[in-house]
Amino acid sequence: MTNPTLLCDGCGQAAAAEHVTQRLQRLEWMTRYRPVHVGTVLLGAYSPDAESDFLYAETEETAGEAARVLAAVGISPDRKTKEVVLSEFQRGGFLLGYVLECPLEPESRSEVAVAALLKARMPAFLARLRRSFQPKRLASISSKLDPFLAGLTEKELGCALVSDGGKSFALDGPSAEKEIEKLREAHAAARAAGR
């Protein structure tokens, strides 16, 4: 049972001890493979539930979102250890981050609740993006972020926004394969242009 007075500082949800422990574990895994110089932050709305879907988890299986992200950046996990895959991702200058650093709790799964959490956390995430990550580029991989990124300038972000005509590359949507290809092409063009 969660204590409604304790809110997680990584997502803003009511948090039990297990929630905080899971957040800290995932933060530790991500930090281990954070590039010294971040080229591109791939930004999701919230962390996936399953550890196999969380790219940085110490699992052998890479599924769901993690597999789609690797496909989008051209890294194949076939016949490689997770450590090798994550090292390639790191050397490529990629960092996968989330506005809400934790999976959604059952009471936070409605569209309205997700939108409210994202709206509340966006200022803190943008500060972290500018002050800590300091990437050259940001590419959103969740359509849930479109209302919050629309209209933001390069100055507000602290980096270039790589987008699909002003929209996110919806790797969390029904046309993920098409979005993977769009992201791959847009990212290559942004790198070639020096953005």
What residue ranges belong to the model's regions?
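Short, flexible loop segments at boundaries between secondary-structure elements
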Residues: 70-78, 157-191
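A polyanion-binding, active-site-adjacent surface
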Residues: 2-155, 159-162
